[in-house]
């Protein structure tokens, strides 16, 4: 009589979302990449908002103009653009998936907007000299340049924020979504703390 001993090894747990499958290591890698992206994006958000506020106030605009440019218009673009782009992204089918092409599309706007805002004083002076100081003052020229690049930055940021959240819903398994968004919020707060600490001491 023979006794056969079998050694069963537990199969690694698998999580699925759509056509994607993850092991525990895959989930960890996914979280690291997404949260690293969120950390960098949060630093950008805080830097852009702080610089834009200081920059536009240096042009001595009224509180009404400040609120219109910095607060009102971004909210309007959010209301109008996000549903349109989200709808198109939901129905897009391509080699890189539904979200990545739209994230790539927003990158040039965000990059150009950030560089342009920083260069607004220089570009404003160039615009004044090109048009003529008798036609436009330095302050008006610099504010015009600032607004162009601020709207570019706002356009790219508004769309990227909506698409990134949709990407998270596409690639993170449903039973991890709550934990992910908790970490997402925590990383954003840590980025804010670090930014304020190193900038303001």
Each model region followed by its residue ranges:
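Helix-loop boundary and gating motifs at the non-cytosolic
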Residues: 2, 6-77
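Hydrophobic core of transmembrane alpha-helices in multi-pass small-molecule transporters
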Residues: 39, 106, 112-163
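Transmembrane alpha-helix termini and helix-breaking/packing motifs in multi-pass membrane transporters
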Residues: 54, 58, 86-91, 118-126, ...
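Loop-to-transmembrane helix entry/capping segments in MFS-fold secondary transporters
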Residues: 63-65, 143-144, 174-184
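Membrane-interface helix-entry/capping residues at the boundaries of transmembrane alpha-helices
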Residues: 67, 89, 103, 181-182
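Glycine-rich segments within core transmembrane alpha-helices of 12-TM secondary carriers
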Residues: 73-80, 110, 178-201
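Helix-to-loop junctions at the C-terminal end of transmembrane segments
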Residues: 79-97
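Cytoplasmic membrane-interface "Motif A"-like loop-to-helix N-cap segments
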Residues: 91-112, 128
């Amino acid at each position: 009589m023979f006794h056969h001993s079998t050694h069963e090894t537990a199969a690694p747990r698998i999580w699925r979302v759509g056509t994607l499958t993850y092991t525990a290591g895959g989930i960890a890698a996914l979280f690291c990449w997404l949260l690293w992206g969120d950390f960098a994006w949060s630093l950008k958000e805080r830097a852009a908002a702080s610089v834009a506020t200081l920059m536009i106030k240096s042009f001595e605009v009224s509180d009404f103009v400040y609120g219109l440019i910095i607060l009102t218009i971004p909210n309007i673009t959010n209301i109008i653009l996000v549903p349109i782009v989200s709808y198109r992204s939901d129905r897009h089918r391509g080699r890189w998936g539904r979200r990545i092409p739209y994230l790539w599309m927003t990158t040039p706007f965000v990059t150009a907007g950030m560089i342009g805002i920083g260069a607004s004083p220089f570009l404003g002076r160039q615009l004044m000299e090109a048009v003529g100081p008798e036609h436009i003052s330095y302050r008006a020229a610099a504010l015009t340049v600032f607004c162009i690049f601020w709207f570019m930055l706002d356009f790219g940021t508004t769309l990227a924020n909506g698409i990134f959240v949709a990407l998270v819903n596409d690639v993170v398994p449903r039973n991890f979504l709550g934990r992910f968004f908790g970490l997402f919020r925590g990383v954003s707060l840590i980025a804010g703390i670090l930014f304020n600490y190193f900038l303001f001491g």
